[in-house]
A protein has these predicted regions:
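A short, conserved alpha-helix in the catalytic core of glycosyltransferases
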Residues: 160, 170-203
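Non-catalytic, C-terminal membrane-associated alpha-helical segments of glycosyltransferases
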Residues: 239-290
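Short beta-strand-to-loop acidic/aromatic patch adjacent to the donor-nucleotide binding site
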Residues: 93-104
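Conserved donor NDP-sugar-binding/catalytic core segment of glycosyltransferases
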Residues: 104-139
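Conserved nucleotide-sugar donor-binding
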Residues: 152-165
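Glycine-rich, basic loop-to-helix element that forms the pyrophosphate-binding segment
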Residues: 71-88
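Short, well-formed alpha-helical segments that are part of the catalytic scaffolds
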Residues: 17-34
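A conserved acidic beta->alpha catalytic loop
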Residues: 43-53, 73, 103-104
Length: 290
């Protein structure tokens, strides 16, 4: 594969893994690893899974460009971003690429080449690809400004993370990308979708459950807690920024519909309801630092 030229900015990648399908995860990693200067693999899996050995054996190439981080605990994503940010600061990386284990590039080389070219012109932008499963806007430009992103595929200049103070670990997983996007824009930077570059991103395992055949992600009670807590904190932290339509969408999807899914379709109803409402309470009482 063609390597990036010396004139390009120095690029650090970060991918988070949690009990992945190893062939799929390693295949996805090899689509972008050759075009990075270094990749941090943040392993949230239990140690007994022995993921490090299995993944590195499967990669076979470019393993000298990998830093592995994992101690058997699941720290989610925000601490991983901050680890990568501090590493980038200390080792003079210009850009940080964020990746999920399930995301698959069609042509990463062309994407990161355009990112590097645009970064050399202006350092005030965060870049992301077009994600068919998530993006609903009408494409009108090859570089189109947008207000949100998902973490996977997004490239953030280290200087922008310096300005906003990295990821807010009040959002370990859920609403983290929303919080980052809002803080980036509040600081005066833009989010630019490079729309001709496609990233296929898995949105989770949706199942039809219950007597009413309702579609649900069937999240664990702990994940339901995280979702209901984090979106309340997001609203309290950014209510001056969020539009009424954004607030309505969040309320409808993460609270009203989720409550109905628990009641009408999902198992362990009492445990799920307990964690769902505990998340709401903890989100309301969480101390906000703006």
């Amino acid at each position: 594969m063609e390597e990036m030229t010396k004139n390009n900015p120095k690029i650090l990648g970060l991918v988070t893994l949690y009990n992945p399908d190893i062939p799929d995860a390693t295949n996805n990693i090899m689509r972008y690893l050759p075009y990075l200067d270094l990749l941090i693999i943040w392993d949230n899996s239990p140690l007994e899974v022995n993921l490090k050995q299995k993944v590195l054996e499967s990669l076979t190439q470019e393993t000298d460009k990998i830093i592995w981080h994992g101690d058997g605990k699941n720290y989610c994503i925000a601490p991983a971003i901050n680890y990568a940010w501090h590493y980038a600061q200390e080792n003079d990386f210009d850009l940080i690429l964020l990746m999920d284990q399930d995301s698959q590039w069609e042509d990463f080389h062309s994407y990161i080449t355009e990112v590097a070219e645009r970064f050399q012109i202006s350092q005030g932008n965060v870049f992301c690809p077009y994600i068919p499963s998530d993006d609903t806007f009408v494409i009108s430009e090859e570089a189109q400004e947008k207000s949100t992103f998902i973490n996977s595929g997004t490239v953030i200049p280290t200087s922008i993370l310096n300005r906003i103070g990295g990821a807010d670990e009040a959002f370990p997983l859920d609403a983290l990308d929303h919080d980052l996007a809002i803080r980036i824009q509040k600081a005066g930077y833009k989010i630019v979708s490079l729309t001709k570059h496609i990233l296929q991103h898995s949105v989770g395992n949706i199942q039809m459950m219950g007597p009413f055949h309702i579609y649900t992600h069937n999240y664990s009670p702990q994940r339901l807690y995280s979702i209901s807590r984090s979106h309340i904190i997001k609203y309290r932290k950014h209510k001056d920024w969020l539009s009424s339509s954004e607030i309505k969408v969040t309320l409808k999807e993460h609270y009203i519909r989720q409550l109905l899914r628990i009641l009408l379709a999902e198992p362990q109803k009492m445990c799920r309801l307990k964690m769902f409402f505990k998340g709401i309470y903890d989100g309301i009482t969480f101390p906000i630092n703006i």
